[in-house]
């Protein structure tokens, strides 16, 4: 029998904590399970999306480099802020009996022009996770960001995946 790998999407919400607890309760001491914790970082602030531009190509290039550097610094800070949430989720899974080597951590960085649902599905494919677990409160934030229902998007585009939505 092959290992079963779950992608558990987390953020700072209570729903994410419930999703992790639910997964811990379901798979507990199961040795054939692996979990990929994927922390979804918030969208990059508007002031870091683009600059005002410049007439001189050299100045434009410099502004682009600075903007890219500022975006990278913002992502590094957001990842650092997310570390306690990942550590907490890891602790819950470990206390339930999941071996440390069966848990990995990833970040779902904000991608320019891509829907969050697409990013999650791509990560699930790359990590070979066949089940995606999300908390419902975190989905409310996604609805605001995406302007539509990410659960429906995950279900519509996620052919071949099982999606667990934890209330």
Identify the function of each model-found stretch.
Residues 1-70:
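Small/aliphatic-rich secondary-structure junction motif
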Residues 73-88:
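Low-complexity, serine/threonine/proline-enriched polar segments
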Residues 121-167:
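Gly/Ser-rich helix-loop-strand patches that form or flank binding pockets
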């Amino acid at each position: 029998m092959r290992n079963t790998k779950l992608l558990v999407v987390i953020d700072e919400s209570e729903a994410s904590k419930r999703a992790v607890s639910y997964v811990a309760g379901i798979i507990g001491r199961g040795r054939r399970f692996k979990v990929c914790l994927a922390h979804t970082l918030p969208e990059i602030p508007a002031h870091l999306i683009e600059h005002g531009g410049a007439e001189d190509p050299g100045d434009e290039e410099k502004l682009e480099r600075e903007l890219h550097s500022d975006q990278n610094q913002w992502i590094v800070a957001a990842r650092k802020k997310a570390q306690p949430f990942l550590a907490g989720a890891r602790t819950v899974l470990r206390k339930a009996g999941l071996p440390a080597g069966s848990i990995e951590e990833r970040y779902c960085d904000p991608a320019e022009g891509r829907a969050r649902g697409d990013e999650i599905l791509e990560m699930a494919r790359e990590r070979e996770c066949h089940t995606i677990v999300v908390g419902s409160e975190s989905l409310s934030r996604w609805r605001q960001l995406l302007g539509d229902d990410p659960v429906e998007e995950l279900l519509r585009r996620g052919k071949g995946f099982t999606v667990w939505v934890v209330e």
